[in-house]
């Protein structure tokens, strides 16, 4: 029996909010630009550029994410912050930038983007309904003004006119640290239906 991606993300987020299991030691995933379909990699930033469009994806740490949420959404409490007593957070965060360089519109659907693990688990970026429902499932009150999180995350269809750009966060719940590899698939659609996409690949660093 297969479950909807949104339902899987909701359950995972609820566990992250409530009492996600802490791995014995830190697990590090390094970018792997050697895979077919990978974007261009510079540091932690993946990208794909053309005369018509550009897409950028940057993995960010907890401090950077919290600062971005505070600046964009005006929330003092980051809803994705590390649970007290845990050394690492229950979420993965990426900054995404989409730019339309063409003379026609560009459509970007965040829910069509995916995180996929080597275990063939899939999840879409978290949206506001999933975040709110997760707090309810964890029997925790949602932060005051949580609806303003939409100012920080890319939530819902984005339509860019010529020359426009949009940026925001993709937030995914953390997966089992036994996973060996994962990838983020990012795609936009140009007016004539042409796809514009790349993948960001990561592999677990071997312990010495």
Regions picked out by a protein language model, each given a short descriptive name:
Residues 1-4:
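Positively charged n-region of N-terminal signal peptides that target proteins for export
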Residues 6-16:
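Bacterial N-terminal signal peptides
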Residues 19-208:
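Conserved functional micro-motifs across diverse proteins
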């Amino acid at each position: 029996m297969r479950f909807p991606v949104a339902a899987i993300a909701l359950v995972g987020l609820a566990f992250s909010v409530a009492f996600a299991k802490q791995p014995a030691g830190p697990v590090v995933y390094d970018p792997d630009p050697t895979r077919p379909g990978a974007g261009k990699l510079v540091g932690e930033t993946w990208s794909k550029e053309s005369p018509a469009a550009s897409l950028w994806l940057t993995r960010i740490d907890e401090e950077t994410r919290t600062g971005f949420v505070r600046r964009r959404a005006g929330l003092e409490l980051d809803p994705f912050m590390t649970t007290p007593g845990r050394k690492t957070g229950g979420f993965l965060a990426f900054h995404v930038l989409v730019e339309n360089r063409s003379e026609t519109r560009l459509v970007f659907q965040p829910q069509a983007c995916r995180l996929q693990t080597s275990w063939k688990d899939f999840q879409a970026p978290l949206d506001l309904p999933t975040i709110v429902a997760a707090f309810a499932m964890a029997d925790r009150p949602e932060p005051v003004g949580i609806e303003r999180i939409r100012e920080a995350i890319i939530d819902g269809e984005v339509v860019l006119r010529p020359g426009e750009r949009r940026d925001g966060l993709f937030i995914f719940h953390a997966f089992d640290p036994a996973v060996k590899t994962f990838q983020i698939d990012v795609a936009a659609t140009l007016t004539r239906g042409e796809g514009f996409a790349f993948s960001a690949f990561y592999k677990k660093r071997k312990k010495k």
